[in-house]
Curated annotation (Swiss-Prot):
This is Phosphoglycerate kinase. ATP binds at K203, G294, E325, G354, G355, D356, S357. It is found in: Cytoplasm. Monomer. One of its GO terms (molecular function) is ADP binding. Its EC number is 2.7.2.3. GO terms for biological process: gluconeogenesis; glycolytic process. Substrate binds at D21, F22, N23, R37, H60, L61, G62, R63, R119, R152. GO terms for cellular component: cytosol.
Length: 397
Protein backbone atom coordinates (compact mmCIF):
# COMPACT_ATOMS: atom_id res chain seq x y z
CA UNK A 1 0.00 0.00 0.00
CA UNK A 2 1.47 3.34 -1.06
CA UNK A 3 1.60 5.87 1.76
CA UNK A 4 1.38 9.65 1.48
CA UNK A 5 4.70 11.32 2.23
CA UNK A 6 6.10 14.71 3.11
CA UNK A 7 6.61 15.32 -0.63
CA UNK A 8 2.83 15.18 -1.19
CA UNK A 9 1.89 18.04 1.14
CA UNK A 10 2.50 21.77 1.56
CA UNK A 11 3.62 22.82 5.04
CA UNK A 12 4.04 26.61 4.65
CA UNK A 13 2.47 28.46 7.59
CA UNK A 14 1.21 25.18 9.09
CA UNK A 15 2.02 23.63 12.47
CA UNK A 16 3.81 20.39 11.58
CA UNK A 17 4.07 17.80 14.37
CA UNK A 18 6.83 15.34 13.50
CA UNK A 19 7.66 12.10 15.35
CA UNK A 20 11.39 11.48 15.02
CA UNK A 21 13.75 8.94 16.60
CA UNK A 22 16.20 10.97 18.68
CA UNK A 23 16.93 8.03 21.00
CA UNK A 24 20.67 8.73 20.93
CA UNK A 25 23.38 7.43 23.29
CA UNK A 26 24.62 9.92 25.94
CA UNK A 27 27.71 9.67 28.15
CA UNK A 28 27.65 10.47 31.89
CA UNK A 29 28.20 14.17 31.13
CA UNK A 30 25.13 14.25 28.84
CA UNK A 31 27.27 14.47 25.69
CA UNK A 32 25.82 12.72 22.64
CA UNK A 33 28.28 9.97 21.68
CA UNK A 34 26.66 9.22 18.29
CA UNK A 35 24.36 11.72 16.55
CA UNK A 36 23.60 9.46 13.55
CA UNK A 37 19.86 9.35 14.31
CA UNK A 38 19.63 13.14 14.47
CA UNK A 39 21.54 13.50 11.20
CA UNK A 40 19.29 10.92 9.50
CA UNK A 41 16.18 12.98 10.25
CA UNK A 42 17.62 16.25 8.87
CA UNK A 43 16.19 15.96 5.31
CA UNK A 44 12.59 15.86 6.63
CA UNK A 45 13.29 18.62 9.16
CA UNK A 46 14.94 20.88 6.58
CA UNK A 47 12.08 20.46 4.12
CA UNK A 48 9.57 21.84 6.64
CA UNK A 49 11.83 24.70 7.78
CA UNK A 50 12.73 25.73 4.22
CA UNK A 51 9.07 25.71 3.16
CA UNK A 52 8.17 27.94 6.10
CA UNK A 53 6.34 25.37 8.18
CA UNK A 54 6.24 25.69 11.98
CA UNK A 55 7.96 22.53 13.18
CA UNK A 56 7.21 20.73 16.44
CA UNK A 57 9.46 17.69 16.99
CA UNK A 58 8.72 14.83 19.40
CA UNK A 59 10.75 11.78 20.41
CA UNK A 60 11.55 9.43 23.24
CA UNK A 61 14.99 8.88 24.76
CA UNK A 62 15.93 5.85 26.83
CA UNK A 63 13.55 4.19 29.28
CA UNK A 64 12.44 6.69 31.92
CA UNK A 65 9.53 4.34 32.83
CA UNK A 66 6.75 6.90 32.59
CA UNK A 67 8.27 9.37 35.06
CA UNK A 68 10.12 12.66 34.64
CA UNK A 69 13.84 11.93 34.96
CA UNK A 70 16.36 14.66 34.06
CA UNK A 71 18.86 11.98 33.00
CA UNK A 72 16.67 11.29 29.96
CA UNK A 73 15.97 14.90 28.98
CA UNK A 74 16.14 15.74 25.27
CA UNK A 75 17.85 19.09 26.03
CA UNK A 76 21.28 17.88 24.73
CA UNK A 77 19.53 16.86 21.50
CA UNK A 78 18.02 20.34 21.06
CA UNK A 79 21.52 21.82 21.44
CA UNK A 80 23.04 19.41 18.89
CA UNK A 81 20.17 19.88 16.43
CA UNK A 82 20.59 23.64 16.67
CA UNK A 83 24.28 23.24 15.69
CA UNK A 84 23.44 20.94 12.77
CA UNK A 85 20.69 23.24 11.43
CA UNK A 86 22.59 26.43 12.23
CA UNK A 87 19.43 27.97 13.69
CA UNK A 88 17.83 28.15 17.16
CA UNK A 89 15.82 25.13 18.35
CA UNK A 90 13.40 25.82 21.19
CA UNK A 91 13.14 23.28 24.02
CA UNK A 92 9.80 22.66 25.76
CA UNK A 93 9.62 21.59 29.42
CA UNK A 94 7.04 18.91 28.63
CA UNK A 95 5.29 17.44 25.61
CA UNK A 96 1.70 18.38 26.58
CA UNK A 97 -0.01 21.04 28.70
CA UNK A 98 -0.93 24.73 28.57
CA UNK A 99 2.63 26.04 28.62
CA UNK A 100 3.64 23.79 25.72
CA UNK A 101 0.58 24.86 23.73
CA UNK A 102 1.52 28.53 24.28
CA UNK A 103 5.05 27.85 22.98
CA UNK A 104 3.64 26.05 19.95
CA UNK A 105 1.21 28.85 19.11
CA UNK A 106 4.02 31.41 19.41
CA UNK A 107 6.08 29.67 16.68
CA UNK A 108 6.71 31.69 13.52
CA UNK A 109 7.14 30.26 10.01
CA UNK A 110 10.41 28.30 9.74
CA UNK A 111 10.90 27.98 13.52
CA UNK A 112 11.53 24.74 15.43
CA UNK A 113 10.46 23.50 18.88
CA UNK A 114 11.53 20.18 20.41
CA UNK A 115 9.12 18.68 22.93
CA UNK A 116 10.45 16.98 26.06
CA UNK A 117 10.74 13.18 26.21
CA UNK A 118 7.40 11.52 25.38
CA UNK A 119 8.16 8.61 27.71
CA UNK A 120 8.11 10.90 30.76
CA UNK A 121 4.40 10.01 30.47
CA UNK A 122 3.39 6.36 30.91
CA UNK A 123 0.46 7.11 28.58
CA UNK A 124 2.84 7.21 25.59
CA UNK A 125 3.69 3.49 25.59
CA UNK A 126 0.17 2.59 26.76
CA UNK A 127 -1.18 4.31 23.60
CA UNK A 128 -3.60 6.26 25.81
CA UNK A 129 -6.33 7.96 23.75
CA UNK A 130 -6.53 11.21 25.76
CA UNK A 131 -2.75 11.62 25.67
CA UNK A 132 -2.70 10.96 21.91
CA UNK A 133 -5.49 13.50 21.41
CA UNK A 134 -3.59 16.13 23.41
CA UNK A 135 -0.44 15.54 21.32
CA UNK A 136 -2.51 15.76 18.13
CA UNK A 137 -3.92 19.16 19.16
CA UNK A 138 -0.41 20.66 18.87
CA UNK A 139 -0.19 20.24 15.09
CA UNK A 140 -2.24 20.64 11.93
CA UNK A 141 -0.16 18.07 10.02
CA UNK A 142 1.38 14.90 11.47
CA UNK A 143 4.56 13.39 10.04
CA UNK A 144 6.07 10.10 11.23
CA UNK A 145 9.76 9.77 10.45
CA UNK A 146 10.69 7.33 13.23
CA UNK A 147 11.02 3.95 11.53
CA UNK A 148 12.75 2.49 14.59
CA UNK A 149 9.51 2.72 16.61
CA UNK A 150 7.05 2.03 13.76
CA UNK A 151 6.46 -1.53 15.00
CA UNK A 152 5.10 -0.19 18.30
CA UNK A 153 1.53 1.07 18.61
CA UNK A 154 2.30 4.02 20.90
CA UNK A 155 0.38 7.28 21.35
CA UNK A 156 2.86 9.27 19.24
CA UNK A 157 3.03 6.70 16.41
CA UNK A 158 -0.43 5.13 16.16
CA UNK A 159 -2.93 6.69 18.59
CA UNK A 160 -2.29 10.21 17.35
CA UNK A 161 -3.32 9.36 13.78
CA UNK A 162 -6.97 8.95 14.90
CA UNK A 163 -7.11 12.66 15.76
CA UNK A 164 -5.41 14.28 12.75
CA UNK A 165 -6.63 14.51 9.17
CA UNK A 166 -3.22 14.58 7.54
CA UNK A 167 -0.79 11.85 8.64
CA UNK A 168 2.15 11.24 6.30
CA UNK A 169 5.53 9.50 6.20
CA UNK A 170 8.77 11.48 6.44
CA UNK A 171 11.67 10.88 4.06
CA UNK A 172 13.36 8.30 6.32
CA UNK A 173 10.29 6.08 6.47
CA UNK A 174 9.67 6.64 2.76
CA UNK A 175 13.17 5.35 2.03
CA UNK A 176 12.70 2.29 4.27
CA UNK A 177 9.43 1.42 2.55
CA UNK A 178 10.98 1.93 -0.87
CA UNK A 179 13.91 -0.44 -0.33
CA UNK A 180 12.55 -3.00 2.13
CA UNK A 181 9.16 -2.96 0.40
CA UNK A 182 10.59 -3.40 -3.10
CA UNK A 183 12.83 -6.27 -1.95
CA UNK A 184 9.79 -8.10 -0.61
CA UNK A 185 7.34 -7.15 -3.37
CA UNK A 186 9.23 -7.08 -6.66
CA UNK A 187 12.93 -7.86 -6.24
CA UNK A 188 15.29 -7.99 -9.21
CA UNK A 189 16.57 -11.54 -9.43
CA UNK A 190 18.61 -13.45 -8.41
CA UNK A 191 17.53 -12.44 -4.89
CA UNK A 192 19.95 -13.62 -2.18
CA UNK A 193 19.22 -13.35 1.55
CA UNK A 194 22.00 -13.70 4.12
CA UNK A 195 20.83 -14.53 7.63
CA UNK A 196 23.09 -14.64 10.66
CA UNK A 197 22.86 -14.33 14.40
CA UNK A 198 22.93 -16.80 17.23
CA UNK A 199 19.41 -18.21 17.34
CA UNK A 200 17.08 -19.82 14.82
CA UNK A 201 14.19 -18.81 17.08
CA UNK A 202 14.93 -15.13 16.41
CA UNK A 203 14.93 -15.57 12.63
CA UNK A 204 12.32 -18.27 11.97
CA UNK A 205 9.53 -15.85 10.97
CA UNK A 206 11.90 -13.95 8.68
CA UNK A 207 13.04 -17.20 7.07
CA UNK A 208 9.51 -18.42 6.48
CA UNK A 209 8.45 -15.10 4.93
CA UNK A 210 11.59 -14.85 2.79
CA UNK A 211 11.09 -18.40 1.50
CA UNK A 212 8.15 -16.95 -0.49
CA UNK A 213 10.46 -14.45 -2.20
CA UNK A 214 14.14 -15.44 -2.41
CA UNK A 215 16.20 -17.63 -4.74
CA UNK A 216 19.09 -18.31 -2.36
CA UNK A 217 19.61 -18.20 1.42
CA UNK A 218 23.08 -18.10 3.01
CA UNK A 219 23.21 -18.93 6.71
CA UNK A 220 25.88 -17.87 9.21
CA UNK A 221 26.24 -17.04 12.88
CA UNK A 222 25.88 -19.50 15.74
CA UNK A 223 22.48 -20.66 14.49
CA UNK A 224 24.31 -22.83 11.92
CA UNK A 225 25.23 -25.25 14.71
CA UNK A 226 21.59 -26.09 15.39
CA UNK A 227 21.26 -26.97 11.67
CA UNK A 228 24.44 -29.09 11.81
CA UNK A 229 23.25 -30.91 14.93
CA UNK A 230 19.96 -31.59 13.14
CA UNK A 231 21.95 -33.17 10.28
CA UNK A 232 23.84 -35.41 12.70
CA UNK A 233 27.18 -33.56 12.84
CA UNK A 234 29.21 -33.12 16.01
CA UNK A 235 29.56 -29.40 16.83
CA UNK A 236 31.90 -29.44 19.85
CA UNK A 237 30.99 -26.84 22.46
CA UNK A 238 29.24 -24.54 19.98
CA UNK A 239 25.90 -22.95 20.84
CA UNK A 240 22.97 -25.24 19.96
CA UNK A 241 19.26 -24.64 20.55
CA UNK A 242 18.32 -28.22 21.44
CA UNK A 243 14.61 -27.38 21.39
CA UNK A 244 14.88 -26.11 17.80
CA UNK A 245 16.50 -29.14 16.15
CA UNK A 246 13.18 -30.35 14.66
CA UNK A 247 12.54 -26.82 13.42
CA UNK A 248 15.96 -26.71 11.74
CA UNK A 249 15.16 -29.94 9.89
CA UNK A 250 11.80 -28.62 8.74
CA UNK A 251 13.45 -25.40 7.45
CA UNK A 252 15.88 -27.49 5.38
CA UNK A 253 12.97 -29.55 4.02
CA UNK A 254 10.91 -26.42 3.21
CA UNK A 255 13.81 -24.91 1.28
CA UNK A 256 14.21 -28.11 -0.72
CA UNK A 257 10.48 -28.36 -1.45
CA UNK A 258 10.35 -24.73 -2.64
CA UNK A 259 13.44 -25.08 -4.84
CA UNK A 260 15.42 -22.57 -2.78
CA UNK A 261 19.18 -22.93 -2.66
CA UNK A 262 20.04 -22.91 1.06
CA UNK A 263 23.75 -22.85 1.85
CA UNK A 264 25.31 -23.66 5.22
CA UNK A 265 29.03 -23.21 5.98
CA UNK A 266 31.46 -25.96 4.94
CA UNK A 267 34.15 -24.72 7.34
CA UNK A 268 34.18 -22.67 10.54
CA UNK A 269 36.64 -20.83 12.76
CA UNK A 270 36.98 -22.60 16.12
CA UNK A 271 38.49 -21.54 19.45
CA UNK A 272 38.76 -22.74 23.05
CA UNK A 273 37.40 -19.47 24.46
CA UNK A 274 35.67 -16.35 23.21
CA UNK A 275 38.11 -13.56 24.06
CA UNK A 276 40.01 -10.85 22.20
CA UNK A 277 43.36 -12.65 22.34
CA UNK A 278 42.16 -16.25 21.95
CA UNK A 279 43.96 -18.56 19.51
CA UNK A 280 41.81 -19.94 16.71
CA UNK A 281 41.97 -22.38 13.81
CA UNK A 282 39.77 -23.49 10.91
CA UNK A 283 37.89 -26.79 10.96
CA UNK A 284 35.70 -28.43 8.34
CA UNK A 285 32.15 -29.20 9.43
CA UNK A 286 32.79 -32.93 9.04
CA UNK A 287 35.49 -32.96 11.72
CA UNK A 288 34.92 -30.29 14.33
CA UNK A 289 37.03 -30.79 17.48
CA UNK A 290 34.75 -31.78 20.35
CA UNK A 291 36.28 -29.37 22.88
CA UNK A 292 36.13 -26.16 20.79
CA UNK A 293 33.51 -23.50 19.99
CA UNK A 294 32.59 -22.29 16.49
CA UNK A 295 32.81 -18.48 16.29
CA UNK A 296 32.87 -17.48 12.60
CA UNK A 297 32.47 -18.85 9.08
CA UNK A 298 35.71 -20.17 7.56
CA UNK A 299 37.56 -18.90 4.45
CA UNK A 300 36.11 -21.56 2.12
CA UNK A 301 32.58 -20.60 3.17
CA UNK A 302 33.33 -16.87 2.90
CA UNK A 303 34.51 -17.41 -0.71
CA UNK A 304 31.43 -19.49 -1.60
CA UNK A 305 29.09 -16.90 -0.05
CA UNK A 306 30.91 -14.12 -1.89
CA UNK A 307 30.24 -15.87 -5.23
CA UNK A 308 26.52 -16.02 -4.50
CA UNK A 309 26.41 -12.36 -3.40
CA UNK A 310 28.39 -11.09 -6.40
CA UNK A 311 26.03 -12.94 -8.77
CA UNK A 312 22.88 -11.42 -7.23
CA UNK A 313 20.75 -8.44 -8.30
CA UNK A 314 19.08 -8.00 -4.88
CA UNK A 315 20.84 -8.82 -1.60
CA UNK A 316 19.32 -8.62 1.85
CA UNK A 317 21.52 -9.09 4.92
CA UNK A 318 20.33 -9.52 8.49
CA UNK A 319 22.65 -10.77 11.24
CA UNK A 320 26.43 -11.26 11.52
CA UNK A 321 28.37 -14.39 10.49
CA UNK A 322 30.13 -14.77 13.84
CA UNK A 323 31.32 -12.99 16.98
CA UNK A 324 32.24 -9.92 14.91
CA UNK A 325 32.55 -7.65 17.97
CA UNK A 326 35.98 -9.25 18.50
CA UNK A 327 38.41 -8.47 15.66
CA UNK A 328 39.89 -11.98 15.71
CA UNK A 329 36.46 -13.47 14.89
CA UNK A 330 35.19 -10.75 12.53
CA UNK A 331 36.81 -11.98 9.29
CA UNK A 332 33.75 -13.78 7.90
CA UNK A 333 31.38 -10.93 8.68
CA UNK A 334 33.75 -8.35 7.15
CA UNK A 335 34.12 -10.56 4.04
CA UNK A 336 30.34 -10.60 3.59
CA UNK A 337 30.23 -6.81 4.08
CA UNK A 338 32.90 -6.38 1.39
CA UNK A 339 31.01 -8.71 -0.98
CA UNK A 340 27.88 -6.58 -0.52
CA UNK A 341 29.84 -3.41 -1.33
CA UNK A 342 31.30 -5.06 -4.46
CA UNK A 343 27.86 -6.27 -5.56
CA UNK A 344 26.51 -2.73 -5.11
CA UNK A 345 29.31 -1.39 -7.32
CA UNK A 346 28.15 -3.84 -10.01
CA UNK A 347 24.61 -2.48 -9.90
CA UNK A 348 22.90 -4.77 -7.37
CA UNK A 349 20.50 -3.39 -4.77
CA UNK A 350 21.91 -4.22 -1.34
CA UNK A 351 19.91 -3.84 1.85
CA UNK A 352 21.19 -4.25 5.38
CA UNK A 353 18.58 -4.63 8.10
CA UNK A 354 19.03 -4.65 11.84
CA UNK A 355 21.49 -3.28 14.33
CA UNK A 356 24.27 -5.89 14.31
CA UNK A 357 24.66 -6.04 10.53
CA UNK A 358 24.64 -2.24 10.33
CA UNK A 359 27.34 -2.16 13.04
CA UNK A 360 29.37 -4.68 11.03
CA UNK A 361 29.12 -2.54 7.88
CA UNK A 362 30.25 0.49 9.89
CA UNK A 363 33.14 -1.52 11.37
CA UNK A 364 34.24 -2.44 7.84
CA UNK A 365 34.02 1.25 6.84
CA UNK A 366 31.62 0.41 4.00
CA UNK A 367 28.43 2.26 5.01
CA UNK A 368 28.55 4.58 2.00
CA UNK A 369 28.92 1.64 -0.40
CA UNK A 370 25.64 -0.12 0.42
CA UNK A 371 22.32 0.82 -1.25
CA UNK A 372 20.29 1.00 1.95
CA UNK A 373 21.06 0.46 5.63
CA UNK A 374 17.84 0.20 7.62
CA UNK A 375 17.52 2.46 10.66
CA UNK A 376 15.18 0.14 12.56
CA UNK A 377 16.29 -2.99 14.39
CA UNK A 378 13.04 -4.57 15.58
CA UNK A 379 11.00 -2.66 13.01
CA UNK A 380 13.08 -3.98 10.08
CA UNK A 381 12.82 -7.50 11.44
CA UNK A 382 9.03 -7.33 11.78
CA UNK A 383 8.74 -5.81 8.30
CA UNK A 384 10.83 -8.69 6.89
CA UNK A 385 8.59 -11.14 8.76
CA UNK A 386 5.70 -9.78 6.71
CA UNK A 387 3.99 -8.16 9.69
CA UNK A 388 2.09 -4.91 9.42
CA UNK A 389 3.81 -2.08 11.31
CA UNK A 390 1.15 -0.10 13.23
CA UNK A 391 2.99 3.23 12.93
CA UNK A 392 3.02 2.90 9.14
CA UNK A 393 -0.38 1.27 8.64
CA UNK A 394 -1.92 4.28 10.43
CA UNK A 395 -0.62 6.85 7.88
CA UNK A 396 -2.74 8.21 5.00
CA UNK A 397 -2.79 6.06 1.86
Amino acid sequence: MEKKTLSDIATQGKRVLMRVDFNVPLDENKNITDDKRIVESLPSIRKVIEEGGRLILMSHLGRPKGKVNAEFSLAPVAARLSELLDCPVGMAKDCIGTEVMQQVLALQDGEVLLLENLRFHAEEEANDADFAKELASLGEIYVNDAFGTAHRAHASTEGITHYVQTAVAGFLIERELRYLGKALQEPERPFVAILGGSKISGKIDVLENLFKKVDTVLIGGAMVFTFFKAQGYEVGKSLVEESKIELALSILEQAKAKGIKLLLPTDVVVTAEISADAESSVASIADMPNNLIGVDIGPETAAAYRNEIIGARTVLWNGPMGVFELDNFATGTIAVAQALADATAQGATTIVGGGDSAAAIAKAGLASEITHISTGGGASLEFLEGKELPGIAALNN
